[in-house]
Amino acid sequence: MSAEYGIARGTGWVALLQQRIKDNKFDVRVVNASISGDTTSGGLNRFTKLVNEKKPAVVIVELGANDGLRGLPLTSAEKNIFSIINKSKSAGAKVLLIGMQIPPNYGPMYTDQFVAMYKKIAREAKVPLVPFLLEGVADKAEFFQADQLHPTAAAHPQILNNVWPCLLPMISK
């Protein structure tokens, strides 16, 4: 969602976040390291270099949807997300975890376990959680591209509004 798949560059929620930060006069620079189609494994593989180069104060972890859409083992996704969180904390960064939901293609047990995974990670890692990035978006067909997976540019202000209340205390201190 964060890589602006299928929408014009600069219209996604991360670009809107940078503008909101600027409008609120916070001295914060946003680095969007998202790659469209990325899995937790891919994110973890790139993360050590990124965290060492960028030295972030806050890391937003928004990964896992592609693992779920591919039916990958949730134990692997969970382990990878925990690793990213732990590496972030070791580098001195605060962490915000973004939860997702997936279509019921793999059955209710997998779908329910997928949602529960984010809650478990947030609880055990003691990090704040945005329970569902697409709250207020997922139930509106007009907010989705033809693939019915990726939001249109019109949905991204709502996506930012879902993240902002949890992120604001982390960047305003």
What is each residue range found by the language model?
Residues 26-39:
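A short beta-strand-loop structural module common to alpha/beta enzyme folds
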Residues 8, 35-38, 72, 151:
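Short, surface-exposed alpha-helical recognition segments that flank or form part
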Residues 8-9, 157:
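Residue-level detector of alpha-helical segments with a strong bias toward transmembrane helices
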Residues 1-6:
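Short glycine-rich His-centered loop
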Residues 9-10, 110:
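Single-residue recognition of alpha-helix boundary sites
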Residues 10-13, 39-43:
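Conserved donor sugar-nucleotide recognition element shared by glycan-biosynthetic enzymes
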Residues 16-26, 42-173:
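Alpha-helical cap/lid subdomain in secreted, periplasmic
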